[in-house]
């Protein structure tokens, strides 16, 4: 018998919204969190704007010693995980630790700390024969992507399968998808799943500057991210984390947990085409959607909302529009599709998990978040992108899709309580 997978807890650290209530308030209002960069001096960069988190780790209960050693992205994940676990009401002291898993994603790991320590060991980049004596003993733990899952597992005593997923901008979706499979296939009863990234750092911003992927609209940052709009000119870098507590459905019911929704299907494919390029037909994303729907035994005409990758680059938004039309057929024109990146930016590996939490909340509130700043239609992007204002709507089946550098294409299907009764 197939094991069903429930979402019983959610937590989020996002630009403009630390914690679930503040996050949903931002999304439902259509406000944007993009401002000028304050985390470092961006002088000389083409894109000098970002969606930063107003984040004080000590104010959110993290231990000062941990804050000293842990990179910002680890801090985000721990705060989001604390919120999700508290929300779920689960008591890990009564759980079998071998049946508790962790699946977390990150695209760039602790680059902020790595850049900082490179300055220390190289005399601000002036030495190639680095002074190893200046390296901090916690550096490896601070920047290694494996630390993300390890630190969260240690915090909650999880001794089941523990993994960090790094598949570029689909890392968060894939971490949730792998968690779903881990429970569905019987390898765990509970999984702490999600993703975290803090990529607003000089080298990371410079990398995306170099390929002109980020918006140069420095004079009007609040309107810089405009997915699907004819005048879009790149994405806005963001940061943050989202964590979900996933449980085998009967396990959740047995302890009387509140069930937000179920994860019904997941799929991921590669395009074997180009590191950053996308095929114009959207075949690989369409394939991911098709397989996720088939996994969930949901018909394309049952989809009530698509949470788009919607990065705001010229090629992505065309590619994604084509993929959704290929998978949903004529129903695509009747299905609202929006991008929350217009409000919280693109936090690379973290955004997929943040978007899954947005989908959980959309199902819970029966409201579709808008695409902020969408004003001028693009003839090649001709679907309903929910411009500027959130929209009440019956939602039973919600699809979240993602696209990552390296050719990764992923999709997760979420089903609300009423969806199983259709």
UniProtKB/Swiss-Prot annotation:
EC number(s)?
2.3.1.-
| Record domain Ketosynthase family 3 (KS3): where | 2-416
Q: Which domain of life is it from?
A: Bacteria
InterPro entries from the UniProt entry: Beta-ketoacyl_synthase, Ketoacyl_synth_AS, Ketoacyl_synth_C, Ketoacyl_synth_N, PKS_Beta-ketoAc_synthase_dom, Thiolase-like
Q: In which pathway does it act?
A: Antibiotic biosynthesis; curamycin biosynthesis
**Class of the enzyme per the UniProt entry, highest EC level:** transferase
What is a single cellular component term in the Gene Ontology annotation?
Answer: cytosol
State a single Pfam family of this protein: Ketoacyl-synt_C
Active site feature? 169, 309, 346
The terms under GO molecular function for this entry are: 3-oxoacyl-[acyl-carrier-protein] synthase activity
Annotated GO biological process: antibiotic biosynthetic process; fatty acid biosynthetic process
Q: Where are the transmembrane segments?
A: none
**Keywords attached to this entry:** Acyltransferase, Antibiotic biosynthesis, Transferase
Q: Which family does it belong to?
A: Belongs to the thiolase-like superfamily. Beta-ketoacyl-ACP synthases family.
Per its UniProt record, what NCBIfam families does this chain match?
PRK07314.1
Q: What is this protein called?
A: Putative polyketide beta-ketoacyl synthase 1
User: What is the native source organism of this protein?
Assistant: Streptomyces cyaneus
């Amino acid at each position: 018998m197939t094991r069903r997978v429930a979402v019983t807890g959610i937590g989020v650290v996002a630009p403009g919204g630390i914690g679930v209530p503040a996050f949903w308030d931002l999304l439902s209002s259509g406000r944007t969190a993009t401002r000028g960069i304050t985390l470092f001096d961006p002088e000389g960069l083409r894109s000098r704007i970002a969606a930063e988190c107003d984040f004080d780790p000590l104010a959110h209960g993290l231990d000062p010693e941990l804050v000293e050693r842990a990179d910002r992205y680890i801090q985000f994940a721990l705060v989001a995980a604390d919120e999700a676990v508290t929300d779920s009401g689960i008591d890990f002291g009564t759980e079998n630790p071998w049946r508790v898993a962790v699946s977390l994603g990150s695209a760039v790991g602790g680059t902020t700390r790595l850049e900082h320590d490179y300055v220390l060991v190289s005399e601000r980049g002036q030495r190639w024969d680095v002074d190893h004596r200046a390296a901090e003993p916690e550096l490896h733990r601070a920047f290694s992507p494996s630390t993300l899952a390890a630190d969260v597992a240690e915090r909650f005593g999880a001794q089941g399968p523990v993994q960090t997923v790094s598949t570029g901008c689909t890392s968060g979706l894939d971490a949730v998808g792998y968690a779903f499979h881990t429970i569905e296939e019987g390898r765990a009863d509970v999984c702490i799943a999600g993703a975290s990234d803090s990529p607003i750092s000089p080298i990371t911003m410079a990398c995306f500057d170099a390929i002109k992927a980020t918006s140069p609209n420095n004079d009007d940052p609040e309107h810089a991210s405009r997915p699907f709009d004819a005048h879009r000119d790149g994405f806005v870098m963001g940061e943050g984390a989202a964590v979900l507590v996933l449980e085998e459905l009967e396990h959740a019911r047995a302890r009387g947990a509140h069930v937000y929704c179920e994860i019904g299907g997941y799929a991921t494919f590669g395009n074997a085409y180009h590191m950053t390029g996308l095929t114009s037909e959207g075949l690989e994303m369409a394939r991911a959607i098709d397989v996720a729907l088939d996994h969930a035994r949901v018909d394309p005409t049952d989809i009530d909302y698509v949470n788009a990758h919607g990065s705001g680059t010229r090629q992505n938004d065309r590619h994604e529009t084509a993929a959704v039309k290929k998978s949903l057929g004529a129903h695509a024109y009747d299905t609202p599709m929006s991008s929350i990146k217009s409000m919280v930016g693109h936090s690379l590996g973290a955004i997929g998990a943040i978007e899954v939490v947005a989908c959980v909340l959309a199902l819970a509130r029966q409201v579709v978040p808008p695409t902020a700043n969408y004003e001028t239609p693009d003839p090649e992007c001709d679907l309903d992108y929910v411009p500027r204002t959130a929209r009440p709507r019956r939602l039973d089946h919600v699809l979240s899709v993602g696209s990552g550098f390296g050719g990764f294409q992923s999709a997760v299907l979420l089903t609300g309580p009423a969806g199983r009764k259709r």
